[in-house]
Amino acid sequence: DVAPSRGLGDVYKRQLEYRPLIGVLTDRVHTPRAIAKRMMEYHLDRDYTMWVAEHLGNPKKEKIYKIYSIEEISEMSFTNPNCVLLMKAPNCALQRPALGIPDTKFILLNDRTKMITKAPIRVIDLSLLELHNSRYFWDIGACTGSVSIEARRQYPHLDIQAFEVRKECENIIRANTRLHSAPGIDLRIGNFLNLSIEKNTIVDAVFIGGHGGKLKEIIRKVASHLNSLNGKIVFNSVSEESSKLFREAVAENGLKLHSEINITLDSNNPITILCATGKNYV
């Protein structure tokens, strides 16, 4: 079966789902050349070969190009209308990557190893968020983008927004998304509390990786958008004070405390992974 796609975002979701055949309806913006360039940028060109058809169904103008090199396509132009068929490359297994990307595989902020959610913690966080049952995911305080990237690779269907206050993290996150073949993450740079979010926006899963001393305010804003039936918030606390603030904010906003997990990695301080749910969660 061919998985149909329209637009670059949909193409990448299909690729990250490891579909063997992907049909793409192109336009004057989402051209075969643009698709090929983007695939190369995110190292997705190794998994697929590309066919391009011009004027399909027109006996006088129809032309079909079977070209194995995505790089070659990235330098070519085609007449409109056209369409693309991506096919699994020979000897390509198309296997979903293992969960838990090693921390050493990420570009860090000023080489600060504590400014990343560690791989074992990251795996637990994503499990608690139940992203397989979610559609919209927010990563607040993304820093390196590790949580968003892991989510994108494991759950390609998600619409992901990553929020980060530090301007210097923008290039780091973008570089990490390219490095780990994780396109389609909507990155928003700025203070989460000051960023505009449409009133009727609903989010299913939220990870709070950083709060800048404004944890209660962040949870209050998140609570106003959280899916009341199956929404989840996960926060990694490294102090009793932040754990206390999280519990208080959950109660103040009519949410439910779902679970707590205490874990210690190596010689690091203990971490309490806290999970809250929407007010009508069952």
Regions found by a protein language model. Name each.
Residues 165-200:
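S-adenosyl-L-methionine
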Residues 230-238:
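Conserved beta-strand signature within the Rossmann-like core of class I S-adenosyl-L-methionine
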Residues 144-156:
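Conserved SAM-binding loop of SAM-dependent methyltransferases across substrates and taxa
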Residues 159-164:
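Conserved SAM-binding motif I beta-strand of class I
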Residues 134-143:
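Conserved class I S-adenosyl-L-methionine
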Residues 61-81, 242-282:
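Active-site capping/gating segments
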Residues 20-112:
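A contiguous loop/helix-start segment that scaffolds small-molecule binding in enzyme catalytic cores
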Residues 1-12:
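Single conserved hydrophobic/aromatic residue that forms the stacking wall/gate
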